[in-house]
């Protein structure tokens, strides 16, 4: 079951067009990953000797978020391999 993080879009997240700046989505996703890990998994990862390093991110931007939107970020650990883990995240609007 995915962990859910809620983000409210604020004015300082926006670019000149009134959309969330693409770099801000990376911050939102990172905050959601930390929410998942701090929810009880972080100590286990550290005990196993995993270094929590992002080596690849693939993003499909489907529609812009704007000021006042409330976003839900679903985060789940998809696979844990000997040298890597795959975390899957999806951002949706709270009302959708």
Language-model regions: role of each:
Residues 1-72, 78-96:
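Terminal targeting signals and extreme-terminal segments of soluble enzymes
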């Amino acid at each position: 079951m995915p962990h859910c993080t809620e983000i409210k879009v604020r004015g300082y997240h926006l670019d000149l067009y009134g959309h969330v700046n693409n770099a801000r989505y990376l911050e939102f996703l990172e905050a959601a990953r930390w929410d998942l890990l701090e929810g009880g998994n972080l100590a286990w990862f550290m005990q196993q000797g995993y270094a929590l390093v992002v080596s690849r991110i693939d993003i499909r931007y489907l529609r812009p978020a704007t000021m006042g939107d409330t976003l839900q970020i679903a985060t789940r650990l998809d696979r844990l391999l000997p040298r890597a883990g795959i975390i899957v995240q999806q951002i949706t609007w709270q009302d959708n």
